[in-house]
Amino acid sequence: MTRGTPAFGKRHQKTHTLCRRCGKATYHKQKLRCAACGYPDAKMRRYDGWGQKVRDRKGQGTGRMRYMKTIARRAKNGFRSGTQAAPKVKAATN
């Protein structure tokens, strides 16, 4: 039985296929689990305890941030809602 470098040439089967949640080719066909996002787990797989690089790739601020990008502006104004802007008064000309 050969071990090591020659044995690696015999590997030609695909262990991973496309994941239906994250779209990466990281869904393990035998384990039935995605290595990237953790599908079919209910919660997305996190990369918290790893290095800075992987957190920058997958963490908050790398996507659309549809909700988070408005937070700074709303916080500056005190999270007010349902109010009307005061009408602008034209400057008096002489």
Curated annotation (Swiss-Prot):
<dbReference type="InterPro" id="IPR001569">
    <property type="entry name" value="Ribosomal_eL37"/>
</dbReference>
<dbReference type="InterPro" id="IPR011332">
    <property type="entry name" value="Ribosomal_zn-bd"/>
</dbReference>
<dbReference type="Pfam" id="PF01907">
    <property type="entry name" value="Ribosomal_L37e"/>
</dbReference>
<feature type="binding site">
    <location>
        <position position="37"/>
    </location>
    <ligand>
        <name>Zn(2+)</name>
    </ligand>
</feature>
<dbReference type="GO" id="GO:0008270">
    <property type="term" value="F:zinc ion binding"/>
</dbReference>
<comment type="function">
    <text>Binds to the 23S rRNA.</text>
</comment>
<keyword id="KW-0694">RNA-binding</keyword>
<dbReference type="InterPro" id="IPR018267">
    <property type="entry name" value="Ribosomal_eL37_CS"/>
</dbReference>
<comment type="similarity">
    <text>Belongs to the eukaryotic ribosomal protein eL37 family.</text>
</comment>
<keyword id="KW-0687">Ribonucleoprotein</keyword>
<dbReference type="GO" id="GO:0019843">
    <property type="term" value="F:rRNA binding"/>
</dbReference>
<keyword id="KW-0862">Zinc</keyword>
<feature type="zinc finger region" description="C4-type">
    <location>
        <begin position="19"/>
        <end position="37"/>
    </location>
</feature>
<keyword id="KW-0963">Cytoplasm</keyword>
<feature type="binding site">
    <location>
        <position position="34"/>
    </location>
    <ligand>
        <name>Zn(2+)</name>
    </ligand>
</feature>
<feature type="binding site">
    <location>
        <position position="19"/>
    </location>
    <ligand>
        <name>Zn(2+)</name>
    </ligand>
</feature>
<dbReference type="InterPro" id="IPR011331">
    <property type="entry name" value="Ribosomal_eL37/eL43"/>
</dbReference>
<keyword id="KW-0689">Ribosomal protein</keyword>
<dbReference type="GO" id="GO:0022625">
    <property type="term" value="C:cytosolic large ribosomal subunit"/>
</dbReference>
<dbReference type="GO" id="GO:0006412">
    <property type="term" value="P:translation"/>
</dbReference>
<dbReference type="GO" id="GO:0003735">
    <property type="term" value="F:structural constituent of ribosome"/>
</dbReference>
<feature type="binding site">
    <location>
        <position position="22"/>
    </location>
    <ligand>
        <name>Zn(2+)</name>
    </ligand>
</feature>
<keyword id="KW-0863">Zinc-finger</keyword>
<keyword id="KW-0479">Metal-binding</keyword>
<protein>
    <recommendedName>
        <fullName>Large ribosomal subunit protein eL37</fullName>
    </recommendedName>
</protein>
<keyword id="KW-0699">rRNA-binding</keyword>
